[in-house]
Amino acid sequence: MSAPPPSVLSRPSRRDRMGRLLPPAAAWLVSNLVTWLIASSSVAGDGSQVAYWSTAGRRRWDAEHYLSIAKAGYEMFRCRDRYADYPDVICGNVAWFPGYPMSVRAVSATGLSYEISAVVVSEASLFGIFAVLWYLLGARLTSATGLTLAIGTVFPGGVYFHAMFPIATGTLALLVCVAGVKRGSWGLAAAGGFVATACHLVGAVAVGMLLLSAFFAWRRDTWSVRLVKAGASAAVAACGVLWTTWLMWQATGRWDAYEAIQQSSYGQSGVRQPFDEMRKAYGFPFGDWYRPEGHLPWLVEHSLGAHRGQLWLNAAFVLLVVATAVVRLVRDRRLGAEEWAAAILTVAVFLVPFFAGAEMSWYRNHAQMFVGLVLVGHASRWVQVPLLAWCSVQYALLGSMFFAGVLV
């Protein structure tokens, strides 16, 4: 009796494929469990108990805008046309990108409410985040990959992965973009980049990374083909911004709707001095502006200024990712395409909010530095274990700020 062909022997069975999903599934469950415990130890802004398993516990100011886009599309108007006592600035929801709310709209077609659909999109994206990270780490359980997944469950700012925000969806898209670069699939990389740019302005970092990919990816191709793949994937990714602009124009009649509301209502226009913005972000008085009512639990009381520790941790994480990349480059004389991509994206995600002037929202945008875990997976356990401990403490503090309504 002849043996089966090698292609059959090498093909993973259904049981093997399911087994490969167990570590990311476990990470997703642990992330929800940890976040629920933090919510249980916190209070809502009105002093009531946090209902983590309800949609109300996952909504913040921006979530209302994303839901409004999912329900009725874009709108822009002079505030005083509707609110007589309001400053004469522009109101509406054109300051928010469509990738996430359009996904929510698609899921709501199943009959689920928009609120539940929003949570489904966020949680499904979070599971996808762990699954793609697991693939990028080699899909083999070791102490290094296990610790990396553990860090991912308490990643800085990761509480927003569970919220009605595009952070999880945008992060998944960036990881898919990195996976496309690793596989040599410019189409997959372009698709991930498109979704990332359609979810949030920070996602535009994918365009820059894909342009640079000609120098570190597509290595089996000639230089001319590498340049074409890099340029084509970056162009497709940039179409996420064009789609956003087109949707806003269709609803408002203005191609500059996003820029107009940012400048009129939020004073954000042009490029800022990043170090000045870091200083403003560090000193922003969240605890004075948004203090929960009534008696505060210990965790909430000690978390009202947690964004300051968050900035230190985020800066340390960027330095760790860059240092790991440099060590691997010196030792091995090369980096994998996915490692180059992850390093570039991590640094860019850290800097973009400060160039844009996002002093009230940088901490959630920085959660997309999750892509840097691709490199952290190669770090020593003497680095990974302290990082896990630091991230765990900071995750609890920032999570408590979120559930208490201190963060927006």
Regions found by a protein language model. Give the residues of each.
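Transmembrane-helix signature of polytopic, membrane-embedded enzymes
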Residues: I116-S117, L133-V154, L172, A337-I344
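Short hydrophobic/aromatic helix or loop-helix immediately within or flanking a transmembrane segment
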Residues: W61-L112, P353
